[in-house]
């Protein structure tokens, strides 16, 4: 039973090549259309969303943030959002439900932030290990806690996104598997529940991509 449930997340292979991972890069095919098609309402809405994110990330980074540093977080948001939505369509591989992708995004970012902070702002990074106003007796204990919480950051970023994607898809799979054994009346309620859950999953897809990008921005602002 558990094998059948989680089989929706299995990467399929053709000629010993995991071609379904290429769905991660399908968004690249949509980029050229921006330059040779007339802007539509969708383009205007998307550009306004990106502009709002740019202003918010700029505020989070503070005055010490470098020019153009928000673009990496906006690109991260766009990549995760697109892949989250792609996974909601039938027969499309959900790449963000695998730690392979989420850890590949979170771990290099965290390592870059840590290397930059410890090399260029060593005293500032040491000061972050002890919160202001901590009694001298608790300082060694707080250093251990802050160090552990700092080390597990990329893991929590990756697991949060992966767990939310897996949970929604498992619920949809469970509801879909019970359909053939139900009467026509109950199938109507089942379809209504699945549509409501699909709307909820769309909201989760947006929220999780936003949370991932915002937390990455906050981690970046701490090393400046």
UniProtKB/Swiss-Prot annotation:
<feature type="transmembrane region" description="Helical">
    <location>
        <begin position="17"/>
        <end position="37"/>
    </location>
</feature>
<keyword id="KW-0813">Transport</keyword>
<dbReference type="Pfam" id="PF00119">
    <property type="entry name" value="ATP-synt_A"/>
</dbReference>
<dbReference type="GO" id="GO:0005743">
    <property type="term" value="C:mitochondrial inner membrane"/>
</dbReference>
<feature type="transmembrane region" description="Helical">
    <location>
        <begin position="125"/>
        <end position="145"/>
    </location>
</feature>
<dbReference type="InterPro" id="IPR023011">
    <property type="entry name" value="ATP_synth_F0_asu_AS"/>
</dbReference>
<dbReference type="InterPro" id="IPR035908">
    <property type="entry name" value="F0_ATP_A_sf"/>
</dbReference>
<keyword id="KW-0999">Mitochondrion inner membrane</keyword>
<dbReference type="GO" id="GO:0046933">
    <property type="term" value="F:proton-transporting ATP synthase activity, rotational mechanism"/>
</dbReference>
<keyword id="KW-0406">Ion transport</keyword>
<feature type="transmembrane region" description="Helical">
    <location>
        <begin position="72"/>
        <end position="92"/>
    </location>
</feature>
<keyword id="KW-0496">Mitochondrion</keyword>
<comment type="subunit">
    <text>F-type ATPases have 2 components, CF(1) - the catalytic core - and CF(0) - the membrane proton channel. CF(1) has five subunits: alpha(3), beta(3), gamma(1), delta(1), epsilon(1). CF(0) has three main subunits: a, b and c.</text>
</comment>
<protein>
    <recommendedName>
        <fullName>ATP synthase subunit a</fullName>
    </recommendedName>
</protein>
<keyword id="KW-1133">Transmembrane helix</keyword>
<comment type="function">
    <text>Mitochondrial membrane ATP synthase (F(1)F(0) ATP synthase or Complex V) produces ATP from ADP in the presence of a proton gradient across the membrane which is generated by electron transport complexes of the respiratory chain. F-type ATPases consist of two structural domains, F(1) - containing the extramembraneous catalytic core and F(0) - containing the membrane proton channel, linked together by a central stalk and a peripheral stalk. During catalysis, ATP synthesis in the catalytic domain of F(1) is coupled via a rotary mechanism of the central stalk subunits to proton translocation.</text>
</comment>
<feature type="transmembrane region" description="Helical">
    <location>
        <begin position="99"/>
        <end position="119"/>
    </location>
</feature>
<keyword id="KW-0375">Hydrogen ion transport</keyword>
<keyword id="KW-0066">ATP synthesis</keyword>
<feature type="transmembrane region" description="Helical">
    <location>
        <begin position="195"/>
        <end position="215"/>
    </location>
</feature>
<dbReference type="InterPro" id="IPR045083">
    <property type="entry name" value="ATP_synth_F0_asu_bact/mt"/>
</dbReference>
<dbReference type="InterPro" id="IPR000568">
    <property type="entry name" value="ATP_synth_F0_asu"/>
</dbReference>
<keyword id="KW-0472">Membrane</keyword>
<dbReference type="GO" id="GO:0045259">
    <property type="term" value="C:proton-transporting ATP synthase complex"/>
</dbReference>
<feature type="transmembrane region" description="Helical">
    <location>
        <begin position="170"/>
        <end position="190"/>
    </location>
</feature>
<comment type="similarity">
    <text>Belongs to the ATPase A chain family.</text>
</comment>
<keyword id="KW-0138">CF(0)</keyword>
<keyword id="KW-0812">Transmembrane</keyword>
């Amino acid at each position: 039973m558990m094998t059948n449930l989680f089989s929706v997340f299995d990467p399929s292979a053709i000629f010993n090549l995991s071609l379904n991972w290429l769905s991660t890069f399908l968004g690249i095919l949509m980029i050229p259309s921006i330059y040779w098609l007339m802007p539509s309402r969708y383009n205007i809405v998307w550009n306004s969303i990106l502009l709002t994110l740019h202003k918010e990330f700029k505020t989070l980074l503070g005055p010490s943030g470098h020019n153009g540093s928000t673009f990496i977080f906006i690109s991260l948001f766009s990549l995760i959002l697109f892949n989250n939505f792609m996974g909601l369509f039938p027969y499309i591989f959900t790449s963000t439900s695998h730690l392979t992708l989420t850890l590949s995004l979170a771990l290099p970012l965290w390592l870059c932030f840590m290397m930059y902070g410890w090399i260029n702002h060593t005293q500032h990074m040491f000061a972050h290990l002890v919160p202001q106003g901590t009694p001298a007796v608790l300082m060694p204990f707080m250093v251990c806690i802050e160090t552990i919480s700092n080390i597990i950051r990329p893991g929590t970023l990756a697991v949060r996104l992966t767990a939310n994607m897996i949970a929604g898809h498992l619920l949809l799979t469970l509801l879909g598997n019970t359909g053939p054994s139900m009467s026509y009346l109950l199938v109507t309620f089942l379809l209504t529940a699945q549509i409501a859950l699909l709307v909820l999953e769309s909201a989760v897809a947006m929220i999780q991509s936003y949370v991932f990008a915002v937390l990455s921005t906050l981690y970046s602002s701490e090393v400046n």
